[in-house]
């Protein structure tokens, strides 16, 4: 009776979502495809991402208000470049092409795309032409946008007009009669000025969409899906103490109660005193936490390993080994839950394998292909800021919810090169000093992520009258909304001076401290 009721509820929810007019994102492999969906969901409109090769018949059966063609790593003239059925443009549904999507529109309609003599990556200034278009309604004549392209439009197709340009390329085109639009830049990226307004113009003024999506209703759906999928089976979850795994744990607990078993694996690669902080969660949130000290095993497996991808794979494999040993003690454990989020999935690989892999994430790229446990990832379609909002709704305290992210592989990917116990000890002390000073100076919650990287580079120094030859540490602090793009944090010089002085004087093994001032893109937040 209970499960019949749940199935009925899910049927109602699925029927509701099928009847909602959605914005459809056709994914051509861009690292930002899901971010487009995030931006539009943020303004209250249901958005779905599907592979570009989805059959036209399926698309016709969807209730769509508008279609967005994402960017992608390919050139439209490359062999086997992703393409599109021209019938898409005969559905009388507005279409917006972004970057590769715009170039594909130009090619399909008979225009010309060529290789740039000057590629554009990063910030550029855009200028609007004196052409009336709803796409740029209520926008100034010039503003900053984010570019990321190696090809450009050389000749626009017949019946299209140019809406905007930069000093190097045609930045936007449109066919107003057919409601087909193109942008060479990325409005979905937070550092593109007025990007949200451009998307709002497309969604509300051109597609005539209505607000129909809320985070709260989506969370309720996820809880019911967990109940239906897991049933009476048990779920095992690796609890790291980070925001993602804690929110994941409380969501699953809400769905299956005592059938959730949280496992805290001490890998020896954690922040200083991390084990004590995580075990405190047991009492704060009434979680069933099993503690396992596997620090020696992890360190032995990482011996002589320098390649970051190999380190991630080894750690992921050993995590699964630990969990599967636990399941031998309880045959009713059938699922391995992870706090995988959208940005993890995007940076590892696109679901359709069209995107260029940046790096594998421990949650998605570090697990072995064959394992007995089934995977449960209730957060893998949410971005970090959405997860924080879910955490607020679940009653998670500020100090737990706004802790700076910590990667699954831990300090192994903040120690560049081989991992040793000596390096772990050095890095733990250095990161602890940085965190202490951030709290002391009321800066911790002003920064989204702060950590220290230990380089495999030694340099000469002088302490007292003695020559030193020790490691170099790099401080990395960033601010970001969604972790898809990020800017380095401009910290006060006096603060940096204090942190540097403390690390060099208090941490044996470091005699030089640098500050990383690179943004994402082109850099990633973590070094490995």
Swiss-Prot record:
InterPro entries linked: Class_I_gatase-like (IPR029062), GATASE (IPR017926), GMP_synth_C (IPR001674), GMP_synth_GATase (IPR004739), GMP_synthase (IPR022955), GMPS_ATP_PPase_dom (IPR025777), NAD/GMP_synthase (IPR022310), Rossmann-like_a/b/a_fold (IPR014729)
Short name of any one Pfam family annotated for the protein: GATase
Pathway recorded for this protein: Purine metabolism; GMP biosynthesis; GMP from XMP (L-Gln route): step 1/1
Residues in Glutamine amidotransferase type-1 domain copies: 22-212
Active-site feature positions: 99 (nucleophile), 186, 188
EC number: 6.3.5.2
Principal EC category: ligase
Chemical reaction(s) catalysed: XMP + L-glutamine + ATP + H2O = GMP + L-glutamate + AMP + diphosphate + 2 H(+)
Disulphide bridges: none
Domain GMPS ATP-PPase: 213-403
Gene Ontology molecular function: ATP binding; GMP synthase activity
GO CC annotation, single: cytosol
UniProtKB keywords: ATP-binding, Glutamine amidotransferase, GMP biosynthesis, Ligase, Nucleotide-binding, Plasmid, Purine biosynthesis
Binding sites annotated in the UniProt record for ATP: 240-246
The keyword Acyltransferase appears for this protein: no
Its biological purpose: Catalyzes the synthesis of GMP from XMP.
Subunit structure, as described in the record: Homodimer.
Protein name: GMP synthase [glutamine-hydrolyzing]
Source taxonomy: Bacteria, Pseudomonadati, Spirochaetota, Spirochaetia, Spirochaetales
């Amino acid at each position: 009776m209970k499960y019949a009721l749940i199935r009925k509820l899910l049927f109602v929810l699925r029927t509701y979502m099928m009847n909602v007019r959605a914005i459809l994102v056709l994914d051509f492999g861009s690292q930002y495809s899901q971010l487009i969906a995030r931006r539009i969901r943020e303004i209250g409109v249901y958005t779905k991402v599907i592979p570009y090769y989805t059959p036209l018949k399926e698309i016709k059966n969807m209730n769509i208000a508008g279609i967005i063609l994402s960017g992608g790593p390919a050139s439209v003239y490359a062999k086997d470049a992703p393409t599109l059925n021209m019938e898409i443009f005969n559905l009388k549904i507005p279409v917006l092409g972004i970057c590769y999507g715009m170039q594909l529109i130009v090619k399909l309609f008979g225009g010309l795309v060529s290789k740039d003599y000057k590629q554009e990556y990063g910030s550029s200034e855009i200028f609007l032409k004196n052409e009336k278009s709803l796409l740029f309604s209520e926008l100034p004549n010039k503003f900053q946008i984010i570019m990321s392209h190696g090809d450009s439009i050389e000749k626009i197709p017949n019946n299209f007009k140019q809406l905007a340009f930069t000093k190097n390329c045609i930045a936007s085109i449109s066919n107003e009669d057919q409601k087909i639009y193109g942008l060479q830049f990325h409005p979905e990226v937070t550092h593109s000025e007025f990007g949200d307004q451009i998307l709002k113009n497309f969604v509300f003024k051109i597609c005539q969409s209505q607000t129909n999506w809320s985070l709260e209703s989506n969370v309720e759906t996820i809880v019911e899906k967990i109940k239906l999928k897991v049933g009476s089976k048990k779920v095992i979850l690796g609890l790291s103490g980070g925001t993602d795994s804690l929110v994941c744990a409380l969501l699953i607990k809400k769905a299956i109660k005592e059938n959730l078993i949280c496992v805290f694996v001490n890998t020896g690669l954690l922040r200083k005193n991390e084990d004590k902080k995580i075990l405190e969660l047991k009492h704060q949130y009434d979680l069933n936490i099993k503690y396992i000290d596997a620090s020696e095993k992890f360190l032995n497996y990482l011996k002589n390993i320098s390649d970051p991808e190999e380190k991630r794979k080894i750690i992921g494999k050993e995590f699964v080994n630990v969990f599967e040993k636990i399941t031998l003690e309880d045959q009713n454990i059938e699922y391995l839950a992870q706090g995988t989020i959208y940005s993890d999935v995007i940076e590892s690989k696109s679901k359709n394998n069209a995107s260029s892999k940046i790096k594998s994430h421990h949650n998605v790229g570090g697990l072995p292909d064959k394992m007995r446990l089934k995977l449960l990832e209730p957060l893998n379609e949410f971005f970090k800021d959405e997860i924080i909002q879910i955490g607020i709704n679940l009653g998670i305290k500020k100090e737990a919810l706004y802790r700076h992210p910590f990667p699954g592989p831990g300090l192994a990917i903040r120690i560049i090169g081989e991992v040793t116990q000596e390096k772990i000890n050095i890095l733990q002390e250095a990161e602890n000093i940085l965190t202490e000073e951030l709290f002391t100076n009321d800066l911790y919650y002003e920064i989204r992520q702060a950590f220290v990287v230990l380089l495999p580079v030694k340099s000469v120094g002088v302490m007292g009258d003695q020559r030193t030859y020790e490691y170099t540490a790099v401080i990395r602090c960033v601010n970001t909304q969604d972790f898809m793009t990020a800017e380095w944090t401009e910290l006060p010089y006096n603060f940096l001076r204090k942190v540097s002085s403390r690390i060099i004087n208090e941490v044996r093994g470091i005699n030089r401290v640098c500050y990383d001032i690179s943004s994402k893109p082109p850099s990633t937040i973590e070094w490995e």
